[in-house]
UniProtKB/Swiss-Prot annotation:
Name by which UniProt lists this protein: Crossover junction endodeoxyribonuclease RuvC
Active site: D7, E67, D140
GO MF, one example: DNA binding
Taxonomic lineage: Bacteria, Bacillati, Bacillota, Clostridia, Eubacteriales
Protein's gene: ruvC
Organism in which the protein naturally occurs: Ruminiclostridium cellulolyticum (strain ATCC 35319 / DSM 5812 / JCM 6584 / H10)
Its EC number(s): 3.1.21.10
Cofactor(s) this protein requires: Mg(2+)
Amino acid sequence: MIIMGIDPGFAITGYGVVKYEGNKFSVLDYNAITTVASMKFSDRLLVLYNELEKLINKFRPDAISIEELFFNKNIKTALTVGHGRGVAVLAAAKSGIDIFEYTPLQVKQSVVGYGRAEKAQVQQMVKAILNLPAIPKPDDVADALAVAICHGNSHRMGALLGNDRF
């Protein structure tokens, strides 16, 4: 199973593509899609959409997992991230590939085993699970890989419980 994880954002959207076979993960690709602050708002969203569409077409994942937004105290930041998230969900939905959404708590629980884990703990586990030489940077990329791992683990649990939705 090929899983694309997306950590949505406006300035930076992290993505990670992993292959999950049996109970082992291997990384196929990971990076960040960035937009330039001087660009028009709509053009930045278009860049994000076009880049995600290219990646989806290149890897043809079996599932796309996206991190849900958590409440942000800065309402303007939350709104701009929300726009980026909407574009990511649209690109995924347009592809016809199943979309799975996970909260940060679910991702931490799945990757680290503790829902209140610190970001550094999640990053270390991503590095270890995927046998990477270093923690992926920026943080958004490690987060995207973590949400992909979360879906792989959820898929395995769903299969064990006889739930074919995953």
